[in-house]
Amino acid sequence: SNVSMLTKANYSHYQMLQEIETTFKRWSPAVFLGYSNINFDDEMLRKEFFKGLRQPYLTNTNGNKRQDGLNIVRAAFAVNDKIMKTETNEKGNAVMKLESLARMNGIESSGAHNALFDAHLTKLVLEKIYKEQNITWRSAMMTGSREEVENFSRNELMFSLNEYFYGKSKLYLVTPLYHEHMLHPIYKWVQAFDLRFDPEIYFDLPLDELKKEMKKTPKFIRTIRSNKAPVLLHSDYASKAEPYSAMTKEQLLKRAKLIKGNKDFCARVSLALAEIAQEKRDTGDQSDITPEESIYVKFVDNKETPKMEKWHQAGWEDKIKLLDKFEDERLVEFGKKIIYQ
């Protein structure tokens, strides 16, 4: 952007958000996909919608799903690191920035970092994966919502989880905990056991010892962030990677069945997770959090949604009066700021 573009814009910020929300609702239900959007674009959009008295979770509710092109690219590299040509950084790791990937694979990228052009680049980069590693693409399209991730996890004895650490895309062979205790007791993310570890070592540990072991790295309990579009693949992929390739299929199956069959152990893991989460909450000071930063601290009650819709439909004078109808003080403050601006 430049000064001219900003000063001659057709919309105010309030009007722009209204147009975005209207367009997204018209497209819905849809899969909202970008490149590195889960941790950047989506977060920015959610916070702006939240401050704008709109639905912050529009892109992953009411039948909508999310996926991230970067997640798909990383998973594709974990399966086959020759899927695309890449640059390498000073640490020798593959560079997965959109512009770099496009340029290295013969895609014109001189207009990169323009929003519309980046969307076009994302399409072209992902088309290569769609054509050359379709199983990864199809797997990604099956985990675009929390419900899909949970259903997949419940129905599979074990599977390959793709994670990205310190510039490396890795595959982990995991089995979800017993279904009653599969979700984190606080955050509701899927919890799975890493089959590189022998589960019997942990079965009889007292709770305090179990918590100590769970805090060590590498972790034997892996968190699958169900609402962040993880890419989950068939167990064959991780079983061919180290360290799982050194184990027999029978050994891995035995470990998976031991986890699924030990309801008591899974219950104690769940209890340990709850206590660890509470300990972190107790040591965290949230007294200085601003209303804008509180989006994940306290969700807006559903009964406020019709009030927000009515507020947007009202004229500016009536908007001031309607602020008294909100029970959530954050919404009152946001409304005052919108009127002032």
What function would you assign to each model-found segment?
Residues 1-5, 24-133, 140, 311-341:
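Metal-dependent phosphoesterase core characteristic of DEDDh/y 3'-5' exonuclease domains
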Residues 2-81, 239-252, 260-293, 300-303:
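Conserved DEDDh/DEDDy metal-dependent 3′-5′ exonuclease domain
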Residues 11-14, 24, 32, 40, ...:
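Phenylalanine-focused residue identity feature
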Residues 19-21, 43, 48, 87-90, ...:
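Glutamate identity and glutamate-enriched acidic tracts
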Residues 23-24, 113, 179-184:
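A general structural signal for short secondary-structure junctions and capping/turn motifs
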Residues 26, 46, 54, 66, ...:
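Arginine residue identity/basic-tract feature
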Residues 128-263:
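Acidic two-metal-ion nuclease catalytic site recognized across multiple nuclease folds
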Residues 203, 209-341:
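Non-catalytic terminal regions of proteins
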